[in-house]
């Protein structure tokens, strides 16, 4: 059980919440802050004060005063009118993450909702009722209005949910779980939909998958080094300490650990003086991608615990301030950076694939074919990898450099952060398939070199991989092999810890 406080949620906790479906509870002290802030909102309504989002319309309608008797209708209208998402739904993990993050931001006690609203969000999480939320339609400021409106519909007993493996109307799930839909009161509709939880939840999922892939890429690259009789001297710690980047030093250390008892890697001058960059510069390139991952994680953990609502309520209602914390620019930049960092792992992997299959670049059978000429072997696998990395270059174009004014130019600059986050996840799926292709080719090369000569770590990895796909003894439909390895890398992440390889120094 993870206790939400509004200020201490971590990516590691989100891993458990999203993938192990661990439950959540609210910190009592934080809930007390929620209750106190709610009292301030009710006093504002009772006194008839003009406060944006509480007693006024929204966006360009901020100068329209709402009568006390119309406040509840205002909130309901807001949710229904803003539920304009389109396209395929987000994965359930993202939907679940949005519920958790929205509850966590409310627990900061500056949004003005009743504790009832927070409790309803937590009930949905704990009962695995996940809103069906279309992926497209958010500008990333005022936050993720459309996606979060689809989330909010479920609290009202409207919209659809994923429940017990099916896509059903929200009321079916609520009724089966004995939950009553709620009626939103002043400020609560706006507090539910004004924020960056869609881009952040998708960003968390993307980061978690990217981190696992980054480790797996080092194992796969190590196996390629063996298949190509790579020079281990390039990974000497003196080389990497001379440059000074922590992440580069750590990648070199991990690869030395992985290959420490390999009989296939060579010494400088043994077969050749130096390797091509895609082998020699693995620590420099993969290390730079780790720098990106560290940056992204830092920004995500700030945003996970941020108040991204508007307006925010301070000092018992004495200060109700309209700000712009809903603007997704920090996450938009982080997601665009993640796109570039992960695309580069695929770029260098594709070049290693080329070195594994090109007979002009190695002494292996052409295209790793068992019968060159009669059988094409891995020839078209490299085509597939080239296509995937080329697609990544298009997806890696920064979404955050774009902005389109909305709400009659009241919201005249937006982040496009959710587009960046979605594209980051698409890139990561492509990267995984490129790495799957490299792994298939590296395993085949290792067989030609001699499996018994591999390091202890790569030998284990090889045998695990061979449980997913057989050796290439004849041409076959290799698409199936690629998807099988990619699925295995995603669902059964083979970690460095399982190979007794230190993840960090």
Curated annotation (Swiss-Prot):
In-chain residues carrying the UniProt-annotated modification 2,3-didehydroalanine (Ser): 142
Pathway of action: Amino-acid degradation; L-histidine degradation into L-glutamate; N-formimidoyl-L-glutamate from L-histidine: step 1/3
Entry's Gene Ontology cellular component terms: cytoplasm
Keyword Lyase: yes
BP terms from Gene Ontology: L-histidine catabolic process to glutamate and formamide; L-histidine catabolic process to glutamate and formate
Its EC number(s): 4.3.1.3
Keywords: Cytoplasm, Histidine metabolism, Lyase
GO molecular function ontology, one term from the record: histidine ammonia-lyase activity
Entry's family note: Belongs to the PAL/histidase family.
Protein name, as recorded: Histidine ammonia-lyase
Source organism per UniProt: Bacillus cytotoxicus (strain DSM 22905 / CIP 110041 / 391-98 / NVH 391-98)
